[in-house]
Amino acid sequence: MMRFVTEGYHHVKKSNSRKYRYILALDPSGSFYEGKGTTGWCLFDTVKNKFINCGSLYAKDYDSMEAYWQAVIDLIKQNFLSNTIIVCEDYLLYANKLQNQINSRMETPKLIGCLQLFCYQYNLPYHMQTASEVKTRWANHILEHRGYIELINKRGEYRPTSGKCETYSHHSLDAIRHAIHYAIFKNN
């Protein structure tokens, strides 16, 4: 049986000191009843420094909250390659957003909990990062300057410069931020 250690929100093999070749980054929104959420994702190859695929899952495309959440888990199953770590945006209730969450059923933290449990049950390494950790550091102009994304129209919409892009949303762009941040600062 493998020994695992959970350090805060980081679940990896205790003896793991290798770099991951692939990063499957997720920007989940569990909101099914509260605004129809969108989960953005990307699969990044750290050796080639390129995206393999990215996209979005839309809650409105599913009949129930649980079916949507299962689709996110299925996405992990379909895109998890050998030597992959899952990097997921964590949910943190910021003081300036507190009033907006009154009477919320907190669907996004529930989805994130499902994803963490799935990773734990199947011994998939994962790491949680907050939005504030990556949004300022990886603003669009920085990602564009580094060649990860390109501006595609005058409305300020961006797309990755490599890989397939099945469906795309600003949540996909946030997943890109999480992948790049982990690849550069934490993948060691």
List each language-model region with its residue ranges.
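Phosphate- and other anionic-substrate recognition elements at nucleic-acid/protein interfaces
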Residues: M2-N188
